[in-house]
Amino acid sequence: MKRFLLVPALVLASCNSVYYAAWEKLGWEKRDLLVSAVKSARGEQKEAGEEFQDALTQLKKLSGYHGGNLESAYNKFKAEYEDCEAQATKVRSEIREVDQVARDLFREWEREIRQYENASLAADSRAKLADTRSRFEQLSSTLHAAEASMEPVLRQFRDQVLYLKHNLNAAAIGSLRGKADTIQSDIQRLLEQMNRSIAEADRFIQTMK
């Protein structure tokens, strides 16, 4: 069994090597790719924050329904929820990319330190590696905290979409009013966590220049 499990890992390692080699030909080292990945993750988080706020706006409109096309209002909320799910997937993917590039960068850095003949240069490089790794761990922690903060809100949105799908009436809409306030509090916490993550990404990018 272990022998077969090694095959995907070897294929993945080979793909990563080809990927990095292609970028190196264009003058992009892993350090540059890590900065680019962090910028992408930061951008997707900003977009996610906007999507969650838009979904909350539609939910509030739906909860304040006083006549009109109820199904149309529900469909708008459902569409915003689906946009949130899609954007959350992008955020998760970008964070996985950041983690992968960082791991590969640090492995390469460690290998290259062992190639030094000059002990002083090796020690200096080792200290810089430790500092960069420490700063990255702080960034990674905030990225994953922001990622985790999305799920409670998504679950609540999902529950409302599923419930309203089969109970689209005035009584069900009335029950949304208290839920909207609860979800707003969760979204506020989500946005605060994302803002911390975005600020940490900004600091990390500056130190990598």
Where are these regions (language model features)?
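C-terminal motif of bacterial Sec signal peptides marking the signal peptidase cleavage site
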Residues: 12-14
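Extended amphipathic alpha-helical interaction segments
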Residues: 94-174
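Immediate post-signal-peptide N-terminus of mature secreted/exported proteins
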Residues: 17-84
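Long amphipathic alpha-helices with heptad-repeat character
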Residues: 41-52, 81-84, 88-102, 143-150, ...
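Long amphipathic all-alpha helical oligomerization modules
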Residues: 19, 144, 148-209
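Primarily heptad-repeat coiled-coil rod domains in cytosolic scaffolding/tethering proteins
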Residues: 22, 29, 36, 65, ...
